[in-house]
Amino acid sequence: MRTKTFLLLCIAFITLFIGVSTLQAGHYYYKQISLKDGLPSTVRCILTDKQGFVWIGTRSGLGRYDGHELKKYIHQANNPHSIPHNLIYQMIEDAQNNIWILTDKGVARYQRQSDDFFIPTDETGNNIIAYSACLTDDGVLFGSKNKIFFYNYQDTSLRLLQTFDLEPNYNVTLLNLWDKHTLLCCSRWQGLLLLDLNTGKCRRPPFDCGKEIMNVLIDSQKRIWVAPYNGGL
């Protein structure tokens, strides 16, 4: 009798455990977004914004997934409020919930109310082409070819902040703030540079990791982690 009671208790416990586990697992939902949903085969970057949308940057345009369907945004030559180009380099959301899209032909800022894009220009009226971006306390820094642009939260302006010529044709493909006035710039094929945002002076870092850099990261203790091509970490 005791054995039978023990077995019944074990079965009841296992059943209860499975039921609780099933309820907990029910909070997770997995869905594959594939070619049949309209997603191009080459995904370059992904961003989840504060409203829960998933933004997908590809070589063939921009996608926004809301959990049910994928909406596509592509360049339209006759539409000044479409993205400037279909090749997406990077996406970033700032402290004001602006979503910035960095494309091959210019930077775009998503306008939620009209569901389209604002294309900022430089002082000559040309699109601002940037390959990387990073957040600061006061705004957003954008890395271009031998140039750094800055978007100011206070007056919502996007302007040229610094130029540098230590290396010609230096495309800033990665940006990180080392401290409040020193910017760590990375070019995929031309290595790392340290740019003083106050003076505009540029120099090489006090270590050599080669010129083919895949990625770079500054941790919470201000240590720099570099991933050279085929060179470990």
Cite the ranges covered by each PLM segment.
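Carboxylate-rich, polar loop motifs that coordinate divalent cations or form catalytic acidic clusters
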Residues: M1-L233
